Amino acid sequence: MEGVEGGPRGAGPPPARRGGARKVAWVLVDGLGDVGSPELGGRTPLQAAASPGLDALAAAGLSGLLDPVAPGIACGSDTAHLSLLGYEPRGLYRGRGAFESLGAGLRVDAGDIAFKCNFATLCEASGKITARRADRHFEAEGPVLCGALDDLRLPGFPDCRVRVRYATEHRCGVVVSGPGLSDQISGTDPLRDGLPLQVPRALDPADAAAEHTARVVAALSEQMTSVLKRHPINVERARQGKQLANVVLLRGCGGRLEVTPFRERHGLRACMVAPTKIIAGVGITLGIDVLDCPGATGDYRTNLTAKARAISAALAPGAPGDYDLGFLHVKAVDDAGHDGNLALKVNLLRAVGEMVRQLARLLWRHQQETGIEYVLCCTGDHSTPAAFGDHSHEPVPFTVAHLADVVRALGGEEALGCVSLEAVQMPPVDAPAAAAEAGGGRVPGAPVAGDAVGAFDEIAAAEGALGRFLGAGVVPLLKSFVLRP
């Protein structure tokens, strides 16, 4: 096969960029994939969701199965996004800390080390972490605690500067500046509840800089815990019987990557909506503009409609930035998988499908008014099966279609005009999985540009014309849709 190594079947090298090219709206659903569940009659959450919006997108275009990095790898969101955006993570990756910190708004310079961190609960008597996530709803308390930790002084290391910034939910970014630091160390996160807080160690004991850095980070962890356990917020949480946020788990130590910017690498001007800070940090690293989107929170309460409006506005002809590609990230589905909440994952996927219908309506308005054509794409960055509560290696469905074909699959312009642009209602966390709409949203047949797939799920996608391919093939495939006659 000619074209990108690991690319989809038939995806040859795209032609050179030309004027008047189409624009792409790319919806990335974090933790999209799953496995069949007995509670759902053997179906996956996507099959149970039977979303009219997602199924119409699949019916309108070309589908396949995507291994974001490579088959058999249960990848992290950061490595998956690097791969999907055309950057080989196995040759670049140096930890996720810089991504989280950049996304949170911290500056990361050459020589700095950065961490992706959790506010967590430490049992002081046993030294064990009883809860790696102190509280998912931490928007009020998190910034205050980060303020108490920012510019912390480390005894014995007067040349080191510590900066802390709140990210989302229970997360924060931490950057340490100082002479002779190395990112070749382990962190303090035991990765599972019920295990002891870890002591930072040099990955290579013969590496003097790493040994020095491990001592710095051990001092940092100790100082942070000392401040947090006395903080009035934790005094009040103890009084209320809540889990304490008395420790910061430091993980993913890394420095900032220096890479060829996305536009220079691919010839596309790109923007993204990504309230999840680690994804925003990946975008910043690659030179992708991260858009401000009020109401987009990166959790179960996010405003999906606000995201659709932001991407539509950014891709409007004549809009600032003159973007060719808008990347819309949805985090909540992944959280449901991590929380083991199968019904919530089903309901959230239906909400995402409704957002896709809204996005189609908003972009169709631009296309009708200006003649600029649009392409819609939807996929995930990895599977997060609710039964496992963590990332897994299963491939994820992928689909891409011309907007005009999506409109036909949704029932035509009249039906599209009936799609509400009111804010998509996010499902309650404890709601049961709602019954699928009559007919399941499947669209019989497919427009000319599509294949025989009529549903967006892990099983149907396996029959798609694109076959099974690697994340490295996504951007070249999208460029072929953008640039072909």
Regions found by a protein language model. Give the residues of each.
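Feature captures the catalytic ectodomains and active-site-proximal regions of enzymes
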Residues: 2-485
